[in-house]
Amino acid sequence: MPTSADDSLPLEDSEECDAYIAKFLRPRTHLFSTVKQEKQRRESHDNKYETAVRSKAIMPSQASKVYRKEMFYSTSKCDSRFINNLHTFNTFDGGSGYSEASPHYAMDFVKNKGFADDEMAGHLKSLEVSRKMTENVKWLNDNRNDLKTALRRSNSCPEFPIDRDREKITTLRRNEKRNENAKISNFDASFVPELCCSDDYPSILCSIATAFKTVVSRVNAQSIGSGELKIAKVLCSTEDLFAYVIPKRFNTRDALFAFSNQFRAWLEYKPNVQLYTHYRFINVILYLEEFKHERTEFRRARHVCNLKSRRNHGLFLELDTGMLRVVEITPEKVRFLANSWAHNPSAIVEVRFDGVKNEKDISEEIQAIRNTGRATMISFDREHREHMNGKWPNPRTWSSLGTVVLRRECTHHKDHSKPPLTRLFCEDRDCIGLCSTGDYFKVPIPEEPNPSHDKLVELRARFASERTLGYTDRTPIAAYILPNTDAHQNELIPDFFSRVQFLNGYSGPSGLAIITLNEAMFWVDNGLLKSAESQVDDRSWTVKEYQSVEEVINWLAKILPPKSKVGFDPTLVSYTWHQQALQSMTSDRFELVAIPGNIVDEIWRMRPFQRGDVVKMLDKNTPEIPVHVKIDRLRKSLKPNKCLAAVITSLEDIMWLLNIRGNDLPYNPVTYSYLFITMSDVRLFIDAKRLNDVSKAYFARQSIDVDDYKAASPYIYDWISATKSSFADKKILISPETNYLIGRLIGEDHSMIDPSIMERIKKIKNTDQLKGMRASNLRDSIAIVEFLCKFEKERRDGYTFTEYELAADIEEVKTRNREYIGLKQPTIFSAGEHSSVHAHRPDAQKIVFHYQQFMFQTGSHYTDGATNCARTIWDSYPTEEFMNQYTLVLKGHIRLASASFPKTLTYGSRLDIFARIALWDAGLDYDHETGHSVGHFLNIRDTQIVIGREPYSSNSIIEAGQVMTIEPGYYSEGMYGIRIGNCYETVDVTLSQNDQYFLRFEPLTLIPIQTSIVNKDLLTSEEINWLNKYHFKVFSKIGYILRKENRMEEYDWLFNACQPI
């Protein structure tokens, strides 16, 4: 071989190298030509066979003609699984020797396979495979059922007819009546259970196809977002080119838990009802005893058909798992399912594929999805529920009901240089290059698609769009500011407003995205930094810690050319943020320009539906202050501040003032609205779809005018214009959350930004509310005790769990309580190194081992209050380092929880040091607040009062009658995390020394704190005394209830957990 003149130039890159490689490979070309001829022979054989089968009018099939691969029996050890439709027995000797016209007998394909059964062999010799399948099965059923598997392995072609040409399909409207030619194909290997050998198999496939067509799109109430859809499983496709998938985002375990608990509670609530309700062959409830230990034994299902081959058995399709079940039809196992449950969201989503014309196309699409686990949603075949409100129970006008249109993900190939010559040879010393030529000509590795990059390219093109130029004096913008929020500055937002997630994948709260022509930066608080780094696509985005408005403005000034224009959505940027940004500008290097209408929405073609149902008024028994009393208090607070009116944009404040609740946001019972209050009028701006006759009548009784949500800013503008003469030195109260669109209408001169007015009105709970908070925390504590008891027992019994399963278990024990409404925040459950990220989301793949530490935080809404708690557990042998750090966190918790402090002018920041001083002495700290206020059946925090390091403000004074959390922690990066959190009520206390009024914390959360991992030597006698008193209170209250309810297993566990140290 020649050598390169330039030693730095690889030999394979020299000009003469190609000729020598060709010469080297020329004697070996027969290897490649043989493979090519074999491939052509196989394809020709399959084509001939398809023609022959069609001419014989055998039922067409959708089985893929792939050599040495048979879908259902690929795990079989029998060689017959390598037969392609029973016609190519030996792939290297020219085939089986049977032509398409020859009669094929079963024994021909199992001979020399060790069959010692003469009776079996004799019968097989007389059975023609392609013509006597029914007779085969009947003989086996009657005589040798134990040998059915052997015959099944040798009989496949009659079961799978040939593909039919469906190119004439021109409409998406489907015939939902039973069609005897209906069938399914491309089904998942685990989808069709033990039915392949049934004599009514074709009828079963027809019934399954009919069931899918008539039920799935009608119960699909998932709100599916646009863009990439991650798919857990493709179940099957039907002959009219539709397919059925299960998205990864559907929480199957939660759905199973929820339904089982609902139905179990219904049975308990209706003690006189017939235990086994009447069964109908439509929607049913299956009782599957094998899942009783998981508490998901009750399953929603759709009846598919009765099985002829199994007496009194039916085939059912589970709506929450997509599994087919063969169940004996008895009153105990199969019951009637009410429509109110049948039409809740299903796991199964009906899809079709863009551009698919025949069954070969759809098979390719499905295979691509199974390889990648994803596809791109490009549109919906939407069918709205509103016109069905009279027919459908629990209508959800915001949900997708029809079919999702998919397009597979495109793959890109990397540019690659010629491979090195050394790849032709293996490590064997005598290798002559025969063994590695295939590796030398290997196809380039597909490159992962980068949808984030594509979206940024499309977004940047909008920087100079005609609509954008209309707001920027015909100058393209150089950057776009995109806060991860909505028009009311909420941290947790629904999918409909998750524009940042659409662009970069981040699904957490808060954050600020800035897109320039060359960079994409995402700023997020320190506590969420690790979570953001794990979610955001780092190929196109840079994640940075957010510290201040000034830092962001300085970064923009540094990278942008002079006289640049920076666009933003005036509904997403708050008025206060905009004011701070203007103050931070030290030069006129760029200008902030409000561009109405978010430009991200222009490229967001498949935006999720906007969730939310009709608002609900609080029950008369709910311990809330009447609406007119709250509004009068607000008006009295406005007068001393010379305010003519108040614009309330905080959704929580609006819900609290009007005693209503909604479900537009996840975890927070609020609905999108604005409230405008003057000295004489109250006007609510809300979407008309959120109102019904009941709510309209309620607002009329409260003398509240109602207008459309989008009319808020025009109305305020008109009101200000009409009352300008009355302003003079008067102002309008707005909150810090007020967006720039509304804030600029009022202006700096006539606006008063003071959150303390609303804070003072609502931060003190009344007697009834405090009573409800105590009761709800007591119920929640009992549920957590039950979970910990069950978890400890099952771990001793050898069970293993994932983080996700345990988080679901926590919610499941809470749902048994009738007053339980839902989660107040996403449950955090993290084990081992995952717990070092304090906002970690449960991982469905992370196993919690018995020797691992784990941490959980959970909060819930109840009809009479709300809860929040956190615990860290290690039931094995913790390290000394962990025990010391756990004890320091506990010391901080005890010091703050046992502190007494003056009743007046005590700010949360002044108390924060109690929780941190023990950690500081050891050179440790944590990067989140120590505590916050807790809302009464509202947001996770109902005021701005926090216990943290941030400088105090006038609205963070702690007073009696509040509910606060205390939850210090410590996080060892990559190792573990520690957090101990309780809810506390602030109560008055008189110290005997001087009779001055002080405050202290009274615990509401009554859950044991693990003492076996405490280093007692680090605790003072006062701290030990507090811990023992706390456990005495826990056992006295929780233990009394457990004993009264005869729950002795939990009682014994609690007794051991509350032993004094």
From Swiss-Prot:
One of its GO terms (molecular function) is metalloaminopeptidase activity. It is found in: Cytoplasm, Perinuclear region; Cytoplasm, P-body. InterPro entries: Creatin/AminoP/Spt16_N, Creatinase/aminopeptidase-like, Creatinase_N, Pept_M24, Pept_M24B, Peptidase_M24_C, X-Pro_aminopeptidase_P. GO terms for cellular component: P-body; perinuclear region of cytoplasm. SUPFAM superfamilies: Creatinase/aminopeptidase. The keyword NAD does not apply. May interact with pid-2, app-1 and prmt-5. This is Protein pid-5. It comes from Caenorhabditis elegans. The lineage of its organism: Eukaryota, Metazoa, Ecdysozoa, Nematoda, Chromadorea.
